[in-house]
Amino acid sequence: MMNKERFARVVEEMKRQGLTQILIADDPAIFWLTGRIVNPMERCGAILLKDDGEVHAFMNNLFCFEPIDGMTMHYYADGENPYKLIADELAPGKVGFDKNWASKHTISVLKERDDIIPVLGSDPIDVCKSHKDEAEKEALRHAANINDMAVEFGIKHIDPSLDELTLSNMIEEFFEEHGAVQDMQLQYVCYGKNAAEPHHGAVAGEMLKEGDAVLFDLWAPINNYWCDMTRTVFYKSCSEEHRKVYEIVKAAQQAAIDFVKPGVKMSDVDAVARKVITDAGYGEYFLTRTGHGVGMTVHEPPEASPSCDLIAEPGMCFSIEPGIYLKDDVGVRIEDLVIVTEDGCENLSGDIPRTIEDIEAVMN
C-alpha cells in the first residue's frame, strides 16, 4: 500500500527545496514509498510526485504493479511511448529528475516537451530516506546482528588451506542461510597486501601466510535493509608495525563514534577520524572517506567525508570506517554502523570484538 506518511514527508521536503514536481525512478525509493518492488531493467518505470500531493505512476503492463489507492496509474505496452504519458502530466517549468534514472529515459522525456527545465530531483527523497523510523531502525539492527554472526563465522573459519575466494563463498552461503538475498556480490576477504586495496575483491589462488592481515568487509540485504561491517585480524602473529597501525585505526574509529551526535557536520565526523590518523603520521595512507549512509541500499546519503556538510540528525544511519592502507604491505580497516540518537549514537555492532586480543580469542 502507498505509505502516505512518507509521501507527505517528501512533499514537505520538496516545498522546502523549491521543487513542485519530481520524477522518482530509483527502485529502492519506489519500494520505500509504495512497498512494491519494481525492476524495469531497460524499460521505463517512474512515479511523478507533485507538491500538492498528487501522485502518478507510469509502468509497463508487464511489471505486475497493481493499482494503489491515492495513485493515478498509467500503463503502457511494449511498442508504446511511455515518455509522452509522463510529459502530458508535467507542468511547465522545473522538473526534478531522479539521479539514478538512465539518461535515455530523462532525454526521452525532455524530447516530448520544450517548456520544462530539468533539475536534480533526488534530494527530497534522499533527505527523507536518511531519517529512519522505528521499524527501519529495528530492521537495521536485525541485519547488523546477522552481519555480526557472519564476521564471527569468517574469523572462525580462517584456514591456510582456503584461498580468499573460497572463504568469501563460504561467508556468502552463510548469509543466504540466514535470510540474505545476494545478487552476485562477493564479500571482501583480503589476505596480506591485498588488504591495502580498499576495495579488493576476493580472488582464487590467493593463499594465507603467517603474519598476514585478513580483512573482512561483509555486507548483505536482510529483509530489504542492508548491513555493512569490517574487521581486520592477523593470522597467527602480528608485527609491531602492524599492531601500531591497527591501534591507530581503532583509536580513530572510536574518536569518530564518540563525536557523533545531533547537530555535528558529517564533514567534521570525517575530520575527527582523519586527525587521529594524520597526527600519528599516516594521514597520506587514509585513502577513503570515513563513512557512508546505509539503509535500503548499502551506499546512500549521508556520507562522512570532507565534502559533506550535511548535519547529523536523529535516525540517520551510517558507517564509521577509517583505515590505513600501506601499499604492498598491509591494510587495516574497522567498520561499524551507527544510528544517531537524541544525544549521541547507537553502535549496531558494538558487541563484536575490536581489540586484537579479543579477536584472537574468537579465532581460537
Predicted regions and their residues:
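Active-site neighborhoods and metal-handling regions in enzymes and metal-associated proteins
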Residues: 1-364
